[in-house]
Amino acid sequence: MQTSELINIGSDTLKRKSIESHRLDSEIILSHVLNTSREKLLISENKVSKENIIKFKSLISRRLYNEPIAYIINRKEFMSENFFVDKNSLIPRPETELLIEPIKRLFEKKSLFFLDIGVGSGCIMFSILKELKNSKGIGVDICKKTIFNAKINLKKLKIVNRAKLLCRPFEEVFNKKFDLIVSNPPYVVKREINRLSNDVKKFEPKQALDGGNDGLDVIKKLFTSLEVFSNLMEF
């Protein structure tokens, strides 16, 4: 079977289940299976092996149940870098990239030592380290599997000597002085979680979404602990 035929089969299968991005998803999944870029996939026509056809159909089946593409291919782009993700890490959002530029602008001529609370995949922390070559950071998360994923990304981006990842509550690192704290904490109101799209509420880690009854549980806990936070830079 040719690549174009397989893309059409995958797209039609997803379309019947009302997956809006059916064509794009089919292309992304096949390019992942064939270990090629989507661009190269679309400009060439090749025969697909039986083994890869089986693998492709298996991944399409996962998408039929609304599993996010990022978890299916274990990859999500953030700030032009591909980050490893699975069900233990919140999928990086494009809008989160908006955090990076102001930090880069404020600290580009300084040596920055910062803390990332709820480091997840490491996309925020590692993007800061990538943009600010004189920076160092500590990332904390309470989930061992999440920290494991972050370590995969840390090694891939070759910034191991400037980063430390710890599996512990953030309060336990407040004995250090940081120039900056960054965090993308859970902020969804508990009663609203069931209203989220299926790909989010069924697959992404609840502890990274659930902000408690008012959506501010972690945020209030953080600000309560900030009494011991010092060494803030003046702007």
Residue ranges and their predicted role:
Residues 1-56:
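A short N-terminal interaction module
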Residues 14, 154, 226:
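Conserved hydrophobic residues forming the short capping helix/wall of the S-adenosyl-L-methionine
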Residues 95-195:
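Conserved SAM/SAH cofactor-binding pocket of Class I
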Residues 103, 128, 200, 222-226:
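Class I S-adenosylmethionine-dependent transferase superfamily signal
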Residues 187-218:
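Mobile active-site "lid"/loop adjacent to the S-adenosyl-L-methionine
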